[in-house]
Regions:
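Alpha-helical transmembrane segments of multi-pass membrane proteins predominantly involved
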Residues: 1-225
Length: 225
């Protein structure tokens, strides 16, 4: 890779990292589940695009397989499956009123700053693109956790979990130029199995208490005690 190509690769990767992080912010403020799933699919598309660009720039052919797996699983299959459950359980009309939405968004911004603070010690020994990409990847992971904490619907928790995996996967692409293919296939299979199990879990909970609101589950636990 010559210097000009490397500079283009750096700019594109950092731009995609910023957009992936932006999608995590947008997911934080979403009250409608269908919109949340759509934004997650867009984040998956950006991740697949980043993987394909890394494969082309680094001449790493097995990253093309990773890009295809990401496209199939996180842009098509998993969003389709979650959307199907949302429609089947008639949750698409529900609007989740977020408590302290402004505070949640400020907390998300603080997590991005914290991510850069955590990675500050390695700035002297790492490249500009690596530090920024890793910081934004860590921010995506933390924002996914915040999404799970701030939303009440179990489906939003699943989307947050998948978003965390997106952040970890992007960090692996940037820092290691891609994991070994067998590891990537294993991770993709684990994500697929987790998505299917979550779908079964949704149906069982919905049939039991006719809701996927986590607050209702907590109240049931308090009554049992």
């Amino acid at each position: 890779m010559n210097l000009e190509s490397f500079n283009q690769y750096t700019q594109i990767i950092l731009s995609l990292a910023a957009l992936i992080t932006l999608m995590s912010f947008i997911m934080l403020g979403q009250g409608r589940l269908l919109r949340l799933v759509f934004v997650f699919a867009v984040q998956g598309l950006l991740l697949a695009l980043a993987t394909a660009i890394a494969a082309h720039s680094l001449n790493n052919n097995h990253l093309y397989i990773s890009a295809i797996l990401t496209l199939v699983l996180k842009v098509l299959f998993i969003p389709w499956m979650i959307r199907r459950h949302v429609l089947k359980l008639d949750l698409h009309r529900d609007i989740e009123a977020l408590n302290n939405k402004t505070l949640v968004m400020l907390g998300g911004a603080s997590l991005v700053i914290f991510s850069y603070y955590v990675l500050h010690p390695i700035m002297q020994n790492a490249t500009f693109v690596l530090v920024n990409a890793l910081a934004l990847s860590l921010a995506v992971v933390l924002l996914g956790m915040l999404l799970m904490i701030s939303h009440r619907q179990a489906i939003a928790h699943v989307v947050g979990f998948m978003s965390i995996e997106n952040g970890l996967f992007f960090a692996a692409i940037v820092s290691t130029s891609g994991m070994p293919l067998v590891v990537e296939l294993g991770v993709a299979f684990d994500v697929l199995v987790a998505a299917v199990l979550f779908g079964i879990f949704f149906l069982h909970i919905s049939h039991s208490i006719d809701s996927l609101d986590v607050d209702r589950l907590n109240r049931l636990s308090e009554v049992d005690q």
